[in-house]
Design a protein with these regions (language model features):
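Juxtamembrane helix-loop junctions of ABC transporter transmembrane domains
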Residues: 3, 26-27, 34-50, 68-115, ...
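Alpha-helical segments in transporter systems
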Residues: 19-40, 61, 65, 83-84, ...
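Membrane-integrated ABC transporters
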Residues: 1-35, 50-61, 79-83, 87, ...
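An intracellular "coupling" helix at the cytosolic face of ABC transporter transmembrane type-1 domains
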Residues: 16-19, 107-108, 124-133, 137, ...
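Transmembrane helices of ABC transporter permease
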Residues: 16, 20-33, 64-71, 135-189, ...
Length: 579
């Protein structure tokens, strides 16, 4: 998206707050009018009182002068206050829109996008937009209004000299354009480096246990320092362009303008009938004309940063990598019979990770998929949960194509238990209910008892109201898994997907987990993905995957008798494989 399109799109956000924006604009206009009146009053005071040595009457002028000054301060405050309010309202909307679209995006987006990059867009980049509206935009409008009002007053004093002053403006604008061309790329890279630093920080915090366990602290420090230095290098370059080009140029134009004023009044003081008050007022108006322009141009780098940041936010808002589309039909999953018919799938559109996968499982039955890492086990789960769309073939539930079910019906009918149990910050009860207000405390307790989680919950100080910290770090891995079991059972699913549900459980806890799983599977269609073959021996059918294809299938005993890949895997895990 071009910078001009980004800017005008931001303006549409601003139109949501027309009332506040108009109010802020009125206060800025009043500030400009009052600011313009002050030099005129000073001119009148100089010409009518100081030059004539009349001090007494000048006291009233002085009171009016200070009154106008106070009004200017008040109007400036109110204008900036309401613009800041509009700015942060826009940022709130941008964050809400970004987060709302984030919830719609498919797993494919999150699989390839670093967490820190997303966080950076929702926090740093949106804050940069607030800086634009709260500071730069109000300054821009103030400059425009001040320019118009001041120019009118200058023309009234001397239209000839005003023309000379106006000639400086195109040169100033040209300088800003040159500055923009030189610094735009530097600012863009600088913002990208901030996003990269956030990614490094996020990954470091999430993987701190592994980092410390493998003595990788120094490597992470070096990598973060390298990115940080890169950010500093590009930011310093942009500062050089700002300091060496923009600021000196603006200061030079101002000095030249003063020189023109002095020369003009010096040459035509007597013939044009200029007074000391007029000269003073004109110098003040020149300041009022140039100072806001200089300030605005000096802040142009902030404007550039804000536009670039807004473009990054809009990229997130406009992202349409949504999960596969589902029909809003009235189909209901009644039994949970599942069938895959010659299903093939590729993540990149080039290399198939699943090739002609076919299997079926009836209600109450349990099947399992085993195989080496990368064999396609998790891909089958991703397709069934509609995280990705398959390329060829067909997936049926109760004889109906999976695409014909609504997303709500599919999600409500499928219970998912992952290898790494995820608990939210809240209470034990809220984690089991998952904020489903239809579930009562009794439903929660019933689900916990069903999966043998009630015993350890009941021993907690606040029982079901006990606080769960982020990721449930105060619970053991087995306790976290039992809580996710209770969460799954509380939703009363017809189909269970178990993705390495016992992979991170110790042997002692595994027995309890296995007992819970047996009860969970009864009366439900179950698909399990497992590395521990001991956990799936009672499955109705076990499928062995290799490079995206089913190479063996059968019960545990049948596969052992076959003495193929499954047999070797089983022997290896049992520690009985001959070297």
């Amino acid at each position: 998206m071009s910078k001009s399109k980004t800017f005008f799109r931001l303006m549409r956000y601003m139109l949501r707050y027309k009332g506040l924006s108009i109010l802020a604009l009125l206060f800025i206009l009043m500030t400009s009018i009052v600011a313009t009146a002050i030099p005129l009053l000073a001119q009148y005071y100089i010409d009518h009182y100081i030059t004539k040595n009349i001090a007494k009457a000048g006291l009233y002028i002085l009171i009016i002068y200070f009154g106008l000054f106070i009004l200017r301060v008040v109007f400036t405050f109110l204008g900036e206050y309401y613009f800041a309010k509009v700015a942060h309202s826009i940022v709130r909307d941008l964050r809400n829109d970004s987060f709302a679209n984030l919830q719609k995006l498919g797993i494919s987006y999150f699989d390839k996008t670093p967490v820190g990059s997303v966080v950076s867009r929702l926090t740093n980049d949106t804050q940069a937009v607030a800086d634009m509206f709260g500071t730069i935009f109000s300054s821009f409008l103030n400059t425009i209004l001040m320019f118009v009002v001041t120019l009118s007053a200058m023309i009234a004093l001397s239209w000839q000299l005003t023309i000379y002053m106006i000639l400086f403006i195109p040169v100033m604008v040209g300088s800003v354009y040159l500055y923009q061309k030189l610094s735009s790329r530097l600012v863009e890279i600088s913002r990208a480096k901030i996003s990269e630093m956030n990614t490094k920080l996020s990954e470091s915090i999430e993987g701190m246990k592994i980092i410390q366990a493998f003595n990788q602290e120094q490597r992470l420090i070096d990598e973060f320092g390298e990115v940080n230095n890169e950010h500093l290098r590009y930011y310093t370059k942009s500062l050089k362009v700002d300091s060496l080009l923009l600021r000196p140029a603006m200061a030079l134009f101002k000095v030249l303008a003063y020189g023109v004023i002095v020369m003009y009044f010096g040459l035509s003081f007597e013939s044009a009938g200029f007074t000391a008050g007029i000269i003073y007022a004109f110098i003040q108006y020149t300041n009022q004309l140039f100072n806001p322009l200089i300030k605005l141009m000096q802040n142009f780098s902030i404007l550039q940063t804000s536009i670039i940041s807004a473009g990054r936010v809009f990229t997130l808002i406009d992202n349409e990598e949504y999960e596969p589309e589902q029909k809003e039909s009235d189909y209901k999953i009644s039994h949970g019979d599942i069938e895959f018919k010659n299903v093939s799938f590729s993540y990149d559109g080039k290399r198939d990770v699943l090739k002609n996968i076919s299997f079926s499982v009836k209600n109450g039955e349990s099947i399992a998929f085993v195989g080496a890492t990368g064999s396609g086990k998790s891909s089958i789960m991703n397709l069934f949960l509609r995280f990705y769309d398959y390329d060829r073939g067909e997936i049926l539930i109760d004889g109906v194509n999976i695409k014909d079910y609504s997303s709500k019906e599919l999600r409500n009918s499928v219970g998912l238990v992952l290898q790494d149990p995820f608990l939210y910050h809240g209470t034990v009860e809220s984690n089991i209910k998952m904020y489903n207000e239809e579930l009562t405390r009794e439903d929660v307790i019933e689900a916990a008892k069903f999966v043998d989680a009630h015993n350890f919950i009941d021993k907690l100080e606040d029982k079901y109201d006990s606080l769960v910290t982020e990721r449930g770090s105060t619970f053991s891995s087995g306790e976290r898994q039992l809580l996710t079991f209770a969460r799954t059972i509380a939703s009363k699913p017809k189909i269970l997907i178990l993705d390495e549900a016992t992979a991170n459980i110790d042997s002692e806890t595994e027995e309890l987990i296995q007992h819970s799983l047996e009860k969970m599977r009864k009366g439900r269609t179950t698909i399990a993905i497992a590395h521990r073959l001991s956990t799936i021996q009672d499955s109705n059918c076990i499928y062995v995957l290799d490079k995206g294809e089913i190479i063996e299938s059968g019960t545990h005993d049948e596969l052992i008798a076959l003495k193929g890949n499954y047999y070797k895997m089983y022997q290896l895990q049992a520690g009985m494989l001959n070297k």
